[in-house]
């Protein structure tokens, strides 16, 4: 295959000229030929995005474009970006191209797969109604997860998306004997480092493959790293395994597309996002699915810009998910963690035919009580509690207890809180909230419910408070 030469370089977008009859295909990987690349990154990879005609292709650089200049030689690989898959990736940290970044030697993988694959066909899909217990009360009660489902953790800056994600990894990945893939998309390097050490200390590192394209990396890396992680997860699924796939953060995937969209010559759409936002999200999300061979249970953190859930990026993500866990700044301000909003969060699994009649009625009872409290808040603020009817006073008292009982100490936050983390089985969660809703805990002070695990702990705490 003949070489091409760089003809234009604007940030991460590079135009490369090839002979007219040797134009590379869309998504083909190109590499910087070694000669003359003393200033630029050795072996820099480009991915073809557009064919401009006359032998010129427009590409995105998957790495820093510092030091590139016109006339540099670029060679074709004849194939899309391919990454190592299989058991050789477990316990390793890789970048967008599947290269190791943990300084632990080369990756021993028998197979490489292209990161661009078709989603499974409709007749291969396998919907699941089996519940996945998380041990986090508010999630198990109000927005239960399905095994093989897709979950989104929505929240603005600093309300606890990553801590919730880490607790879910702690509770599910450690209990779950299967394999996990973690894709760090445009997040802090420190969090990736913490995650690695957390897995190492828990002795589950040999069951996790990690792929990172962090905040400091060029947009090309952040745009493709989610696909790299997904390709590794798909390989395990196709072997008949049940996989956990964690993505932190899906918003940065969208943002990376926005950064290069204008440079690629596309007209921006609403709020400056790329016009292909829905398609890019669909291409990724449709591949994260369970087939008759194996399942992928995906948990994705979604940053909500300016706490606005109607922003095009989170709004586009909503339609692909089975469960949505919405983290609220108002609840975090009350000191209730996890700051999950039980009225905003929802799940397709919360159906009496799936979770059972008792679970459904308790969850709806909890939401009803909290909704009544929300409606009465303005009246209480203006007139005070004394003006309420006895029924409303009782509803408010129970709602405040429910609100506090929805809090829970996390294992991953032990170092900050000083209190040991609690894993609460689903049956205990239902029993506890049922007792509060039915009035069996009316005599207990509301402080007794704050930061405890089961309802029995609340009774013990109440005795100490008296």
Swiss-Prot record:
The keyword DNA-binding does not apply. InterPro entries: AAA+_ATPase, ATP-synt_VA_C, ATP_synth_F1_bsu, ATPase_a/bsu_AS, ATPase_alpha/beta_chains, ATPase_F1/V1/A1_a/bsu_N, ATPase_F1/V1/A1_a/bsu_N_sf, ATPase_F1/V1/A1_a/bsu_nucl-bd. It holds the Pfam family ATP-synt_ab. Its EC number is 7.1.2.2. Keywords: ATP synthesis, ATP-binding, Cell inner membrane, Cell membrane, CF(1), Hydrogen ion transport, Ion transport, Membrane, Nucleotide-binding, Translocase, Transport. CDD domains: ATP-synt_F1_beta_C, ATP-synt_F1_beta_N, F1-ATPase_beta_CD. It catalyses: ATP + H2O + 4 H(+)(in) = ADP + phosphate + 5 H(+)(out). Its main location: membrane. GO terms for cellular component: plasma membrane; proton-transporting ATP synthase complex. ATP binds at residues 155-162. It is a peripheral membrane protein. The keyword ATP-binding applies. One of its GO terms (molecular function) is ATP hydrolysis activity. It is found in: Cell inner membrane. SMART domains: AAA (SM00382). Produces ATP from ADP in the presence of a proton gradient across the membrane. The catalytic sites are hosted primarily by the beta subunits. Belongs to the ATPase alpha/beta chains family. F-type ATPases have 2 components, CF(1) - the catalytic core - and CF(0) - the membrane proton channel. CF(1) has five subunits: alpha(3), beta(3), gamma(1), delta(1), epsilon(1). CF(0) has three main subunits: a(1), b(2) and c(9-12). The alpha and beta chains form an alternating ring which encloses part of the gamma chain. CF(1) is attached to CF(0) by a central stalk formed by the gamma and epsilon chains, while a peripheral stalk is formed by the delta and b chains. This is ATP synthase subunit beta. It comes from Bordetella avium (strain 197N).
């Amino acid at each position: 295959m003949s070489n091409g030469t760089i003809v234009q370089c604007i940030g991460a977008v590079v135009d490369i000229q090839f002979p007219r009859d040797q134009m590379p295909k869309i998504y083909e990987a190109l590499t910087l030929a070694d000669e003359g690349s003393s200033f630029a990154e050795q072996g820099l990879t480009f991915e073809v995005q557009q064919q401009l005609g006359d032998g010129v292709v427009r590409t995105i650089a998957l790495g820093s474009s510092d030091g590139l200049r016109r006339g540099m030689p670029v060679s074709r690989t004849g194939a899309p970006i391919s990454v190592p898959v299989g058991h050789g990736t477990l316990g390793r940290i890789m970048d967008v191209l599947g290269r190791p970044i943990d300084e632990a030697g080369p990756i021993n993988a028998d197979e490489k797969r292209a990161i661009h694959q078709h989603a499974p066909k409709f007749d291969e899909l396998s919907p699941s109604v089996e519940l996945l217990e998380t041990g986090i009360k508010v999630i198990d009660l109000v927005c239960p997860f399905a095994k093989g489902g897709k979950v989104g953790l929505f929240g603005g800056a600093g309300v606890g998306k990553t801590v919730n994600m880490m607790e879910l990894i702690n509770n599910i990945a450690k209990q779950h004997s299967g394999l996990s893939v973690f894709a760090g998309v445009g997040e802090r390097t420190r969090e990736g480092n913490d995650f690695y050490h957390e897995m190492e200390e828990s002795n589950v590192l040999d069951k996790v493959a990690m792929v990172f394209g962090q905040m400091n990396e060029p947009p090309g890396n952040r745009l493709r790293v989610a696909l790299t992680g997904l390709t590794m997860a798909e390989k395990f699924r196709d072997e008949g395994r049940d996989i956990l796939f964690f993505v932190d953060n899906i918003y940065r995937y969208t943002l990376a597309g926005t950064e290069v969209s204008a440079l690629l010559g596309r007209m921006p759409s609403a709020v400056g996002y790329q016009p292909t936002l829905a398609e890019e999200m669909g291409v990724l999300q449709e591949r994260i699915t369970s087939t008759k061979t194996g399942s992928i249970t995906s948990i994705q953190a979604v940053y909500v810009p300016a706490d606005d859930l109607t922003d095009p990026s989170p709004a586009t993500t909503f339609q692909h998910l089975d469960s949505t866990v919405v983290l609220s700044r108002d609840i975090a301000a009350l000191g209730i963690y996890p700051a999950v909003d039980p009225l905003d969060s929802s799940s397709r699994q919360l159906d009496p035919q799936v979770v059972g009649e008792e679970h459904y009625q308790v969850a709806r009872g909890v939401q009803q009580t909290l909704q009544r409290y929300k409606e009465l808040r303005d009246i209480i603020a203006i007139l005070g509690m004394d003006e309420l009817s006895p029924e409303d006073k009782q509803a408010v008292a129970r709602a405040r207890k429910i609100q506090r009982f929805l809090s829970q100490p996390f294992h991953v936050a032990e170092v900050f809180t000083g209190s040991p983390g609690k894993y609460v089985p689903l049956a205990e969660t239902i029993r506890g909230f049922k007792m509060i809703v039915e009035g069996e805990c009316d005599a207990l002070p509301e402080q007794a419910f704050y930061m405890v695990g089961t309802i029995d702990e609340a009774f013990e705490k109440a005795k100490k408070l008296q």
